[in-house]
Design a protein with these regions (language model features):
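The feature captures the beta-strand-to-loop junction immediately N-terminal to the Walker
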Residues: 36-38
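A short, flexible loop at the N-terminus of ABC-type nucleotide-binding domains that lies
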Residues: 1-22, 29
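ABC ATPase "signature
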Residues: 208-209
């Protein structure tokens, strides 16, 4: 069974603004997949459909054989591109909340990662630096034992050194049989950890493939291919 199947997915806003158009994708289990495109390409809309936040669309979307809904929320761990922790919660309370809310949450793992990164347990979220707040949210997401992890722009607001740390955390601590989807416009930073990639432009899939196969065939990095593809597309 594939991790995710998408058939003829189209999403419009206001009747004439197309966010996604006729998207067809099959994503396997156990791979790290980059959803790559510029800001406004449709990445976040696609993610919000996969996570059940957006429900009004045409087409079919299946996760682990189930239509997106209550059942699929149980197997998807999602890190949005915004801060979602209550600013007055401490790190310790956030961990306790996740433990109570998610049956698959590994509290010991979360505490181990918090300790490893020297993050204070009893400070309120709003008192932490921006980079530390992002690490707390990432740790909470990774500490669920999920079949699918979805990260929406996890490195957009952090410096290059912190980006490497975030990717190392993901590589070292996710469920190895799971599918990971990382949405980003920072291609050069993410491609080293990807198995597969998807290029999305103006709501349509314009290229996808296996990272090793495509880079070997083209003799170029995914970042270079992305720049060429999107420079050509900008001419039309």
């Amino acid at each position: 069974m594939e991790a995710i199947e998408i058939r003829n997915l189209t999403k419009t806003y206001g009747g004439d603004s197309i966010a996604l158009y006729n998207v067809n994708l099959t994503l396997p289990q156990g791979k790290i997949i980059g959803l790559l495109g510029p800001n406004g390409a449709g990445k976040t809309t696609l993610i919000k459909i996969l996570t059940g936040i957006i429900k009004n669309y045409t087409g079919e979307v299946y996760i682990k054989g189930h239509k997106v809904g209550v059942e699929t929320k149980k197997c998807v761990s999602y890190l949005p591109d915004i801060e979602f922790i209550d600013p007055n919660w401490t790190t310790a309370y956030s961990i306790s909340y996740y433990k109570d809310f998610f049956n698959d949450f590994d509290q010991e793992k979360a505490l181990m990662l918090i300790n490893r990164l020297d993050i204070p347990l009893n400070k309120k979220f709003k008192a932490l630096s921006k980079g530390t707040r992002e690490k707390v949210q990432l740790i909470l997401t990774l500490s669920r034992q999920s079949d699918i992890y979805i990260f929406d722009e996890p490195i957009a607001g952090v410096d290059p050194a912190a980006r490497d740390l975030i990717f190392d955390l993901i590589l070292q601590n996710y469920n190895k049989s799971a599918t990971i989807i990382i949405s980003t416009h920072l291609i050069a930073d993410v491609e080293r950890i990807l198995d597969q990639f998807i290029f999305i432009k103006k709501g349509s899939i314009v290229r996808q493939g296996n990272v090793k196969e495509v880079t070997s065939q083209k003799g170029k990095s995914i970042d270079e291919i992305f720049r060429e593809d999107f420079r050509c597309l900008a001419d039309f």
